[in-house]
Amino acid sequence: ACLVGSEMCIRDRSIPTGFTQRATTGMDATLSYYYHYALLSVGSELMAAFETALAPVALSPIAMEAVSLGVSQEQITTFLLPVQSSMHPLYNPDLDYSIYLSQPFFYVLFQILILLITVYIIGSELKFHTAQEWLTTARGNILTAVVGKLLPYTFIFSVIGILANYILYGVLHIPFHGSLLMMNLMTILFIIATQALAVFIFSIFPRIAYIISIVSMVGSLGATLSGVTFPVTSMYPPVHAASYLFPVRHFTEIAQSMLYFDSGFGYYWQSAAILWLFPLVALLILPRLKHWILKDKEELSICEHETPLPRVHNTSHNSIATVIFREWRSISTNAAILLVLMGGIFAYGLLYNLMYAPNLVRKTPVAIVDNSHSALSREYIRLLNATPQASVYALTPNYLEAKEWLKQSKVDGILYLPADFDARVGRGEQSVFTVYASTDAFLNFKNLQEASSRVMLAVNDAHRAEGAVFLPPQGLLAVASSAPVNVSGTALYNYTEGYGSYLIPAVMIIIIFQTLLMVIGMVTGEEAEEFPKGKVVGKHKKLTWLQALYNISGRTFVYVMLYFVFALFLLGLLPHFFSIPNIGNGRDIITMMIPFLLGTSFFGLAASRYFTDSEAPLLMIAFFSVGYIFLSGVSYPLELMPWYWQAAHYVVPAAPAVLAFVKLNSMGGTLADIRPEMITLWIQVIVYFLLSLWVFKKKVFYFRH
């Protein structure tokens, strides 16, 4: 089988020649299947579908032979599968991906927005030297000043959060088992805690250009450490401990308690109490914020007694070399930009790889309700505990006690073995066990599904012979003259079936895209700040088309050369340290990176028309960082998205670049395999180049008299 994107192509040799003859004559027949695991959502669904569909196929030669000899279908089925499983996904029985992601990821994006806006509105007071007036209005009380500043935004954010809850659970009909009133109250508490975290971070070092970069990183890390995609309990212990420094982590635990189990306040009061700690900690650091405000007043007083030097744009646009030199100097002498480059590229890259380094979710805790207390039930429990996917948390004869453990998040599933579990097998009847699994984390659900089904197959193989006494003679003849089909499954492109192996290649491309846009936004925004109309000694004029071309070409040259070096670190070096898939041809990857970096540079320069300062662009770029992964089509098949998201895929260079890089790097594809993505990227290069040329032609630049 060969898989391209989310489509499956089955070659004519997927089922080997002579398979039917070998299977029906009792010879050794093997059926192999392959599933696409470079794209996790596609791969996991295909694997489950293959296992479900091929399980009866494996035993069909025996069943067909037995039925042809007069054995009833029920008799032979009971003999072949004496033990069967019944899987019950809790809360999301259809395993709907949109239900799983919609609620948590709205709040993941929401917390990024709250962090950025809170830092920006407080930082603007210091940046524009109005902080002293702000403090004076509050009569010197820093607590009054901060609360008065943030309260209107708290109200606005609360309205947004409550409206979102109504849309999610009312309009979109996402299943909700808790109290909507309590959910709204916890949403408001989450908003206050997130604002408090932003105040705390800003008070440590209140330089808006630096802090916005740091806060955007904090928000993105919070998205990962919320535990929505990869359970934090499966991360390294220091990373797991660090997750509790993020309000979104505690709110996620609260929301899941109400969403999945209709849990009362007693089940999540600890998470709510921790959210209250964030405002209290912010209170302790407010004196430091006041210190910075008073210090800003002193610095402003000194500046007022100095003779300001006229600021001019001492730049010629008649030489590409001059533009290159100026752009390089602007980047290398700006500490905030260097922080984005060093922090965004190196810290971001290392942290993401470190967080997902465990790669696989192991030992998902499960509670056992054993009402059988038989040798067969003990054998099943022992085999289940021996699997790498599951771990027996505790045994209890009381289902309600196991359900309490599930509500308390001590376990992620319940295995129920009925009282007649062993007796039915002994009577020649089919015995059914039940697995109740939470769907708050799909990886945990997948673990329990795989572990229970594979142990079931092992138990069936071990005890099938005992059921031979219940078969008529012709049934025994069918068993003796036939053989089951050997079924073998192989994960393509991601042999470990790990989450990090799937996600990290896509994240590395997003980091390049996001930080490059940030750099362009900060450089062009700073130019707009430093040379406002009518506030500069000099004259201004618009560029000619040739000068605009020089300007665009020079800037783009700097960005592309700089990010080629960073790409070597992110895409070439890090995969070797963290065992990330890296089977692509280096020349093909470089060929793909050329239109991606060009398109991103032109995209940023075209958008610079709307960059009026060096901080505002960071708000937009950081906010949408999480969404780029979804637009790419690696987390959810692009073909299954609504048309407007499919259209958005072709607008942002990051989306086709992620898909192209995954095909090259993780799947070992060639340039021919990424032809649609390459065409999209080159079209974006042309469109955004022309658009950026027009933008710079219309821009006003200032020159020395």
Please provide the spans of the model-predicted regions.
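Extracytoplasmic/periplasmic domains immediately adjacent to an N-terminal transmembrane anchor
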Residues: 1-99, 300-501, 673, 698, ...
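Juxtamembrane loop-helix boundary motifs flanking transmembrane segments in multi-pass membrane proteins
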Residues: 77, 90-94, 134-147, 172, ...
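Hydrophobic alpha-helical transmembrane segments of multi-pass membrane transport proteins
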Residues: 88-168, 350, 490-574
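Membrane-spanning helices that line or support transport/gating and their immediate boundary helices
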Residues: 117, 121, 125, 200, ...
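Hydrophobic core positions of alpha-helical segments in small-molecule transporters
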Residues: 147-148, 211-214, 340-341, 505, ...
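Membrane-spanning alpha-helical segments of multipass transporters and channels
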Residues: 155, 166-167, 175-312, 351-352, ...
